[in-house]
């Protein structure tokens, strides 16, 4: 039988775990430390660690202010948690009541597309980036209460058309739910090509 950790040990490990992965849920922490969710919440309160939503918001705001050039914060669908311009980006989107069809609690597809598309725009290292073309695929329906993690990767910065190719894969947990390939127009191309997309 495994010996239970003392409160002090548990809180130190909890703090370290959240510092390593600020997006871990209270439920996952409770399972990891074999305590109730309420115990995790009390530990977080004692340690002055904010709830998951506030931790995500803090990281998203910090990343956006430091890195995103092409979109204002309020125009991004989902919250950007990691970004390296012209390389990769990650965002989280919580599916709420206003995002689903009332009769079946399934997320409307345009929300998943908007998360992926705004992430593809945000990852571009330009003041202006527009979607010229996209190819998307919905793999399975996303439901109310699920958290969608979109991961964008820049595949080709300047292809033969002078466009940037961004691939986005969206997951719920480990399960792939959406994929998209976005051909992005960059503002640096505007002066070279005139105003055609």
UniProtKB/Swiss-Prot annotation:
Pfam families xref list: 4HBT (PF03061)
Keyword flag Lipid metabolism: yes
Gene Ontology BP annotations: fatty acid biosynthetic process; negative regulation of DNA-templated transcription; negative regulation of fatty acid biosynthetic process
Keywords: DNA-binding, Fatty acid biosynthesis, Fatty acid metabolism, Lipid biosynthesis, Lipid metabolism, Repressor, Transcription, Transcription regulation
GO MF annotation: an example: DNA-binding transcription factor activity
Entry keyword Lipid biosynthesis: yes
Domain of life of the native organism: Bacteria
SUPFAM superfamilies: Thioesterase/thiol ester dehydrase-isomerase (SSF54637), Winged helix' DNA-binding domain (SSF46785)
InterPro entries noted in UniProt: HotDog_dom_sf, Thioestr_dom, Transcription_factor_FapR, WH-like_DNA-bd_sf, WH_DNA-bd_sf
NCBIfam families in the cross-refs: PRK04424.1
Job description of the protein: Transcriptional factor involved in regulation of membrane lipid biosynthesis by repressing genes involved in fatty acid and phospholipid metabolism.
Family: Belongs to the FapR family.
Protein name (record): Transcription factor FapR
